[in-house]
Amino acid sequence: MLLNSLFPSILAAATFVTSAAAEDLPPIEIVGNKFFYSNNGSQFYIKGIAYQQNNLDSNSTFVDPLADADNCKRDIPYLEQVDTNVIRVYALDVTQDHTECMQMLQDAGIYIIADLSQPDESINRNDPQWNLDLFERYTSVVDKFHNYTNVLGFFAGNEVTNNVSNTDASAFVKAAIRDTKAYIKAKGYRTIPVGYSANDDSDIRVSLARYFACGDEDESADFFGMNMYEWCGSSSFKASGYESATDDYKNLGIPIFFSEYGCNEVTPRKFQEVGTLFGSDMTDVWSGGIVYMYLQEENNYGLVSVSGSSVSTLQDFNSYKSEILDISPSSVQASAESASGVSRTSCPTNTDNWEASTELPPTPDKDICDCMSSSLKCVVADNVSTDDYSDLFDYVCAKIDCSGINANATTGDYGAYSPCGAKDKLSFVLNLYYEEQNESKSACDFSGSASLQSASTASSCAAYLSSAGVSGLGTVQGSVRTDTSEATTDSGSGSSNSGSASSSKSTSSSTSSGSSGSKSAATAVTVTTLTKIAAVGVSIIVGFGLITM
């Protein structure tokens, strides 16, 4: 009798678990300067943790944190203990499969914000470029992860501009944002926000944020992250600088959050800033933050230490847990935010502290570069190492005008072939030199570094080459190509349909239906908990079955 009375309830619970586990997290959408769940319009606050080994200064290798299912299985329960709903990952290997980790994160109610670059494929502040190689890297990450609805967004750059000496580099990052957004749209993927993560340099931070937020929506950042380390030890809203920062960004018009935070100048960290960040002084402007970082390393920023499959929580973990579980931020509905009509900020003017032009670098277009390369008679030899390119550039460009391959983001002047790859650009200037020397055979040698080829111009190339001009000083309108990426989409769940995130399913039983930061949200039954209930239920059924046999 007892079994008969329990069975319907247990079966119902098990059925609910199966349904919940299969349900995708609703995409997060942007309305005004806030994030919202797309399924019910409730506000979403980022309660995040940076999740990657800190080996990103290397130019060769990095560890993809989402390609190791065992590590994800080990770490996610600890992320859940501190109510994490976002992790930030800084570099991903598109040749790996991420299905298992992404599904485990999905089941735990955790979204990701992923950087599109990797250590040796990123925009270099000292020699900024937005070229075909970078475009293909960025779009390969998009192709790999677009299908997961728990991808909150992408960062197109991290601290690329970090002081007054390199503000021009921001133009290249903004061009990357423009073209990544255009690529997502052209591929028919769901709307996935693309933003930027900045350092907190007092001389440029306001202009930097305004630069990325301003202008046409097709080329502006969808959100802005600030790596904020001003609050150290015991401080306050005013003394920490949080008050002035909040005032600085109150009219930005797009979501802003701490893309890193957690000063460790005073240890152990108390994380008293958490209550302020999610309190009434800041939540109208800020949308939460991402604690730096999960793993303990030499930099002493870790919340846990790891040895193989074993995890040990540190004092910082316990302090953060105490603070983050005690927040109860106010929230609004997307409909109310939409009605408020938040407007975007205006672009900064060029000053001594800000020199990035609002005229952005051109879109990398493989067709244009291929047409140019095929039309050349003198080209760099295939056996020349890319390490030797700089010497050849220096020599040739000291003798001829290389403006056709150069990019000046201060004046907004860009050569027609500036987005092409290094080999194509070097061949172009070698050919210019060769032609200026009346095509003397000796002018296409460079000690064996150059060689002659048969030039050809396809009919489809004529318009490109004519617009660019012989010296590449003309203007050629590139277009976003959708057939350049070699990355394949992971087999994980998620919608790949086009259109706004708001077109997603109207219900989700695996995520909070209210504010992600509220205390009540923390008491919601998670999929993990329900799975345990189902397992217990099955055990009870088996046990009673054995008893009645």
UniProtKB/Swiss-Prot annotation:
It comes from Candida maltosa (Yeast). Belongs to the glycosyl hydrolase 72 family. It is a lipid-anchor; GPI-anchor. GO terms for biological process: fungal-type cell wall (1->3)-beta-D-glucan biosynthetic process; fungal-type cell wall organization. GO terms for cellular component: plasma membrane; side of membrane. The keyword Disulfide bond applies. PANTHER family: 1,3-BETA-GLUCANOSYLTRANSFERASE GAS1. It is found in: Cell membrane. Glycans are attached at residues 40, 59, 147, 163, 383, 408, 438. SUPFAM superfamilies: (Trans)glycosidases. GO terms for molecular function: 1,3-beta-glucanosyltransferase activity. Residues 336-361, 479-519 are annotated as: Disordered. InterPro entries: Glucanosyltransferase (IPR004886), Glycoside_hydrolase_SF (IPR017853), X8 (IPR012946). Residues 487-519 have a biased composition (Low complexity). Keywords: Cell membrane, Disulfide bond, Glycoprotein, GPI-anchor, Lipoprotein, Membrane, Signal. Disulfide bonds join 72-101, 214-347, 232-263, 369-420, 378-444, 397-402. Residues 1-22 form the signal peptide. This is Protein EPD1. Residues 336-356 have a biased composition (Polar residues).
